[in-house]
Structures are given as structure tokens and as C-alpha cells.
Amino acid sequence: MKTGVFVFDVMTKQPISVYKDKNLADCANLMEKKDVNSLIIKNENNKVLGIVADEDFIRKAIAKNVDPFKTKVEEIMATEVITIEPDKDLYDAVKLMGDYNIRQLPVVENHKLVGIITVKDIIKVEPAIFEILSGKIRLKTGDKPDLIY
């Protein structure tokens, strides 16, 4: 079920990212300031090393009572990062998000970070896809009972 909309049409082209040695307090402040739910961790060559989401701060930092000023983001980031290429169909991004239960995908081209696509980005352009992501696909009743929306 391709949409005809590509990842590069929807993605945020300048994602918020940090280097792995940034402390958790600085990362949390940056996320608050930029109003984002995740940060991409990259190296000097713009290669994605990991990702940290707001729930990582809760499960891996707050719950374990770590010092946010002494703990580096590399200590709590997810290193097995699911990514997508900018020329993929939006449906492919939605499928990956659903399959891996994630809310964001770093967009990479030639192993370099070029953007990020989030559930919020997708909902802005294709609100109906939200129902797919949230697992609430329902059979529409009426004249055409086989129509899914």
C-alpha cells in the first residue's frame, strides 16, 4: 500500500542532534528548548551512532537515579538504530515504526544523517496513517463494508 509520498517530502531536514559525550542534563534541556521527543547521537562525520528518546531518560536515568550532570548520553542511548532512506515511500516509514514500536526514524543517505521523520510529521501530511500507527484500523460500516480507513 504505497502512498506516493516520499520520506524526503515529510522529514525534518535539520534534526536536533548531539555528540555522544553530551551530559543528560544538557540533552534534556535541549529537548525541552527545541520541543522534541528524541535526539540523534552522531559523530563528527554526521554518522548516526544512536538515538535517545524521552522514555530513555525515564527508564535508564531517572529510574536508576543517575547524576544527569555526570552521565553522558552515550550511556543511555539506543545503539541499534532503525533508519530509513529519503527516497522511500511514506508507507515504508509507517511500517518500520509499527514493526519496531518506535516514534521516529533517522533519515540517512550514504551513511550520513540528512533528516528525521516522526509520527508527528506523518500525521501532519497524512492523518489517516495515524490509525495504522496506533493499531486502530477499523472496518468502515455503510454502503461499502469492505472499505478500510
Predicted regions span which residues?
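Short, flexible active-site loop motifs that bind/organize anionic cofactors or intermediates
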Residues: 14-17, 47-48, 83, 112
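Tandem CBS (Bateman) regulatory domains
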Residues: 1-14, 53-98, 118-149
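The conserved cystathionine-beta-synthase
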Residues: 17-35, 42, 84-101, 108, ...
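A glycine-centered beta-loop-beta connector
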Residues: 31-34, 39-56, 97, 105-120
